[in-house]
């Protein structure tokens, strides 16, 4: 019994160290691409952490004249003023389109972007999300979107809590596995 417990502990330790080291490289280190002018800016769903305004700001800075904002938050609560505000932020120079992805996942967002790219003859997009989501989002967009993708993290700080990062790594690993199995069909 002790031998089995020791073996299981060693396996757990190796998996934790390897998973943490690889997770750090994949999900904690920056994987931003240099910004360049593209056909559209895509803001993926997630926390209201400034990503929506950041996507619109990138458009104002001239990187694109169309912003797609994923909007899986409907129906809105009375406290949620963010989405109604950003979804009505179009100007004469910038078109903001909010969309509800189906399915309500990164895959659904990438499939919608592919459809919009077909309609509008887009070849390049900037995708804005959390820094730790960029690797998985790049993988999924690579499956679902025929064009070039510039990945860029929303500028923000992240909690240094190792338990939180462990959960983030596990979620991202699971999401990568799911994406590898499901593909984009």
Model-based region annotation:
Residues 1-5, 161-164:
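Membrane-interface helix-boundary signature
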Residues 1-4, 49, 136, 176:
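Intrinsically disordered, low-complexity sequence elements enriched in Ser/Thr/Gly/Pro
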């Amino acid at each position: 019994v002790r031998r089995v417990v020791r073996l299981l502990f060693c396996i757990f330790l190796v998996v934790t160290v390897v998973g943490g080291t690889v997770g750090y490289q994949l999900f904690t280190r920056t994987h931003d691409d240099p910004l360049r002018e593209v056909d559209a800016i895509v803001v993926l769903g997630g926390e209201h952490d400034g990503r929506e305004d950041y996507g619109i700001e990138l458009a104002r800075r001239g990187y694109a004249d169309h912003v797609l904002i994923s909007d899986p938050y409907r129906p809105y609560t009375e406290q949620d003023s963010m989405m109604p505000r950003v979804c009505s932020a179009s100007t004469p120079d910038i078109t903001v389109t909010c969309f509800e992805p189906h399915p309500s996942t990164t895959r659904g967002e990438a499939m919608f972007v592919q459809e919009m790219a077909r309609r509008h003859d887009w070849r390049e997009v900037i995708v804005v999300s959390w820094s730790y989501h960029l690797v998985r989002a790049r993988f999924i967009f690579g499956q679902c979107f025929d064009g070039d993708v510039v990945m860029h993290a929303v500028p923000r700080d992240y909690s240094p809590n190792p338990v939180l990062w462990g959960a983030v790594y596990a979620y991202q690993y699971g999401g990568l596995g799911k994406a590898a199995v499901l593909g984009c069909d």
